[in-house]
């Protein structure tokens, strides 16, 4: 029997889906991402969404100003799609290297998505332009109709939105973000080279029982919501198979403690401090460490047409305890796995 690995050395990873917020929150959370990842796809759903080139440039600078000295980190900016977005502005941002991708939020699907798209038809000229440019479309894949159960939103989205869109725009590059269901895993697996997916650590590690049985755990509440065990297992099997169009996207989404631990709490897991170690634990449990580097560091650049990072990151088998909380101005953040012990650590 082979002894378990004590060190995992991988090309420096990227985070293909992260929320860095703004203001004091931005300054607090950026170092947890910039310390480990070479690049990150930054979500545009600020209180005033990022819909113009100038807004993206200004936000990128605020992010860079929050990166500690010695961290080599490149934020990759995204444009928030709205029904009224100017396709020429989007194209200008893409050609100038400001926008790496554009994000489709169905209206009211998640945090700060009230400005989102009411129907795909409303933005079809923009999507057609993106297809011609080879610009990736990042999709929060849930319908938001009042008559659709929250646990069925993703599966319904595939049938009613995603598949018709991909049939219409056959060469549009699409990232089905933070997939959570067996349906989505199978859909992406069966898709062509224009379709990829990101998967979060929480959806690989937990299911809805973990969030709801024995008391509600608000720090596991995120959108798309955790699903039943069969869906969690499908995601684990997808990444363990070495499937090359699935890659790391933490969806790290910080909210202050008082906005999570309340009668109507916000959705999102702040997992940046422990995400890479969490992924490593999952791959180890699935006897799939041979595919860990590709998931973290190779598959994403391949899909986006970007070079692989030149640096390296080492994880060591050294247990560490995740902090119970992290100071935030006049409040605090409770990180994913707060107070728990993880068996891998990133070597400093």
UniProtKB/Swiss-Prot annotation:
Reactions this protein catalyses: (S)-dihydroorotate + H2O = N-carbamoyl-L-aspartate + H(+)
N6-carboxylysine, modified sites: 103
Keywords on record: Hydrolase, Metal-binding, Pyrimidine biosynthesis, Zinc
UniProt-annotated binding residues for Zn(2+) 1: 17, 19, 103, 251
A Pfam match: Amidohydro_1
GO MF term set: dihydroorotase activity; zinc ion binding
Major enzyme class: hydrolase
Oligomeric and partner information: Homodimer.
PANTHER family membership: DIHYDROOROTASE
Protein known as: Dihydroorotase
């Amino acid at each position: 029997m082979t002894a378990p690995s004590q060190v995992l050395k991988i090309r420096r990873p990227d985070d293909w889906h992260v929320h860095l917020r703004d203001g004091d929150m931005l300054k607090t959370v950026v170092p947890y991402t910039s310390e480990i990842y070479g690049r990150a796809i930054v979500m545009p759903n600020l209180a005033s969404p990022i819909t113009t080139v100038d807004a993206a440039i200004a936000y990128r600078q605020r992010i860079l100003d929050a990166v500690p000295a010695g961290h080599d980190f490149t934020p990759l900016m995204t444009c928030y799609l709205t029904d009224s977005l100017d396709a020429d502005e989007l194209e200008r941002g893409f050609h100038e290297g400001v926008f790496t991708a554009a994000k489709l939020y169905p209206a009211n699907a998640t945090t700060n998505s009230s400005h989102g798209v009411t129907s795909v038809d409303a933005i079809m000229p923009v999507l057609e332009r993106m297809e011609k440019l080879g610009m990736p479309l990042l999709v929060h894949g849930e319908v938001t109709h009042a008559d659709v159960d929250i646990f069925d939103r993703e599966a319904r989205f595939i049938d009613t939105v995603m598949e018709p869109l991909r049939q219409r725009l056959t060469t549009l590059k699409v990232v089905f973000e933070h997939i959570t269901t067996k349906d989505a895993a199978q859909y992406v697996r069966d898709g062509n080279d224009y379709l990829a997916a990101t998967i979060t650590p929480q959806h690989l590690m937990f299911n809805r029982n973990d969030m709801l049985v024995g008391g509600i755990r608000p720090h596991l509440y995120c959108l798309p919501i955790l699903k039943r065990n069969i869906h969690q297992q499908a995601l684990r099997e997808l990444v363990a198979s070495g499937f090359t169009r699935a890659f790391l996207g933490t969806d790290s989404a910080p909210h202050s403690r008082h906005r999570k631990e309340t009668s109507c709490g916000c959705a999102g897991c702040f997992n940046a401090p422990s995400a890479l170690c969490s992924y490593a634990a999952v791959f180890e449990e699935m006897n799939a460490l041979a595919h860990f580097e590709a998931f973290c560091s190779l598959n994403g650049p391949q899909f986006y047409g970007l070079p692989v990072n030149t640096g390296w990151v080492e994880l060591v088998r050294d247990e560490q305890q995740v902090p119970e909380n992290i100071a935030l101005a006049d409040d605090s953040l409770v990180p994913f796995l707060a107070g728990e012990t993880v068996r891998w650590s990133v070597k400093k």
